A protein has these predicted regions:
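A membrane-interface helix-boundary motif in multi-pass transporters
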Residues: 1-12, 217-241
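Multi-pass alpha-helical transporter architecture, strongest
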Residues: 16-28, 231-261
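Juxtamembrane intracellular "pre-TM" segments in multi-pass secondary transporters
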Residues: 29-58, 90
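Extracytoplasmic gate region of multi-pass secondary transporters
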Residues: 51-105
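Loop-to-transmembrane helix entry/capping segments in MFS-fold secondary transporters
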Residues: 105, 188-203, 227-229
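Helix-to-loop junctions at the C-terminal end of transmembrane segments
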Residues: 120-135, 219
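C-terminal ends and interior cores of transmembrane alpha-helices
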Residues: 144-157
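Intracellular juxtamembrane helix-capping segments at the cytosolic ends
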Residues: 174-189
Length: 261
């Protein structure tokens, strides 16, 4: 199938949601906001002046620099460096139960399938295990898993090691991120939690902005030109380690003496 079918499917899905929005969804009644534009900008400045909050976002963005490699560098690495024959053979061997002579191949789109599939299978289990864990410590554990996942890509190009690295990284993602939201709720002022949670998504802006540019530049330098892919992935592992150290120092020195809301 060509790419046009993928785009048509995406258009159909979006159009279907639009129809649901027009004919099924009804906006719940709620009090009209009394804030004018000046007050909105005043609230924005209030958040941006909170250096503890901004520092939290900046530090946590380090993990999202790693995360956005899943949509760039990991895909290039797969296409250029990984021989997925062992995975293909295993899957096709299983598919012979249902069809004759299957010819399934692991391709770039299946990286997202591994990521999403791991979350679907394990998120409830991970959440149940960590429901009473402290947010900061859990974030550190999650980022450690994410760093380890990318580290596996540095030490081997074997197909199953590649899959294992993706799975471990995803476990780190589902461990760290929910607790980050919880952590923001703890450090935000009691009457500004919703406002702070809204601006907490700046981590994505920083992570994607830096991650995309850095990933492309470093990939060309280390992988394409130098033929040293291990240095490329170790660089991102270093960013993960620095993020962990940053969170520990932030909690030890910046939040010392502060009482969470």
């Amino acid at each position: 199938l060509g790419w046009n079918y993928i785009l048509l499917m995406a258009a159909f899905g979006t159009g279907w949601l639009l129809l649901l929005n027009f004919f099924v969804f009804r906006e719940p009644s709620r009090p009209q906001s009394q804030k004018n534009l000046v007050q909105v900008f005043a609230d924005m400045l209030l958040v941006l002046k909170d250096y503890k909050f901004i520092l939290t976002i900046v530090i946590y963005s380090g993990f999202w620099i790693l995360y956005f490699q899943m949509y760039d560098s990991v895909l290039w690495f797969l296409k250029e460096r990984i021989d997925m024959t062992p995975v293909n053979n295993a899957v096709n061997s299983f598919l012979t139960i249902f069809v004759d002579n299957p010819s399934w191949r692991f391709d770039a789109e299946h990286v997202t399938v591994v990521n999403a599939g791991t979350i679907i299978l394990l998120q409830l289990i991970v959440s149940a295990i960590l429901k009473n864990a402290k947010p900061l410590q859990t974030m550190i554990v999650g980022i450690s898993f994410g760093t380890l996942g990318l580290g596996l890509l540095a030490i081997s190009t074997y197909a199953w090691v590649f899959i294992l690295g993706l799975v471990i990284f995803t476990i780190g993602e589902m461990t760290a991120h929910p607790k980050f939201i919880s952590y923001i709720g703890l450090i935000a002022p009691q009457d500004k939690k919703a406002l702070y949670l809204g601006y907490s998504f700046l981590y994505g802006v920083i992570g994607s902005g830096i991650g995309g540019v850095l990933g492309a530049f470093a990939y060309v330098k280390f992988v394409t030109n130098m033929n040293r892919p291990e240095l490329f992935w170790l660089m991102f592992c270093g960013i993960g380690v620095l993020t962990i150290i940053g969170l520990i120092l932030f909690n030890r020195f910046v939040l010392k003496g502060s009482k969470p809301s």
